[in-house]
Amino acid sequence: MSVNGPGVVVITGGSAGLGRALALSYCAPGITLGLIGRNAERLEAVAAECRARGAEIVTGYLDVRDAAALQAWIFDFDAQHPIDLLIANAGVASTLRSSDDWEGAGRTAEVVDTNLYGALHAVLPAIERMRDRRRGQIAIVSSLAGLRGMAISPAYCVSKAALLAYCDSVRPVLARDHIGISVVMPGFVRTAMSDVFPGNKPFMWSAEKAALFIKKRLTRRRVQIAFPFSLTLGLKLLRLLPATVADAILGLLFQIPRRNM
């Protein structure tokens, strides 16, 4: 890692949305990017954009739910390009779609496997190598939904809340080995993923604006990166209210489908 920032960056979920915007924000001559994604065509398109800006790109067509494959790729990549910064960004969204909808075991497991375990499958191998070097930086993309559960997306909220708790838990331990870990908590970002959520999307940011905001604060090694400010403050204040009052307020903002009796 140079004084100007990380020279080697790995980003999961790098083929679209926020991951693509992050890749483009970091790519420059002298930078090596490891981009991981499931869609080979889209990932290669992002890689081509980054190469055009002078960065060295290594792609991995992987599903983050495949722990063994992801660990093998990260170990192999790190052996050639010691990772300065890993951004665990891959994720999926899920919401209740109708009055009779319910997130059962299958849907809940799919979301948790990708958002929670997929992130851990990426960061744990990287941390292992960073601890050997006694340096490095990890960023995990959670969500403001991790601050307070919403009835419209239970599985998504629990997966993101778990990431926040994980970062808080391991931060003091990793600090002993000079490894920083940051939790990124975006609000609504204009991507295909946000299209899954119906109704109001207050204070929505573009992916490009979000990526630059995140990069700037990762450079400063901020432990929590939450945005936008108004929505962050509102959700933190909701946690101080009685649960029934907070539920009612969120119900007005993010209406769940009503069931006809």
Where is each model-derived feature located?
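Conserved mid-core segment of classical short-chain dehydrogenase/reductases
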Residues: A93-A109, I152
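C-terminal helical subdomain
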Residues: V183, G199-G234
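Residue(s) in the substrate-gating loop at a strand-loop-helix junction
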Residues: S143
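Conserved glycine-rich Rossmann-like NAD(P)H-binding loop of the short-chain dehydrogenase/reductase
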Residues: I31-V46
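Conserved glycine-rich cofactor-binding loop
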Residues: G13-A16
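Rossmann-fold cofactor-recognition segment
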Residues: A52-A68
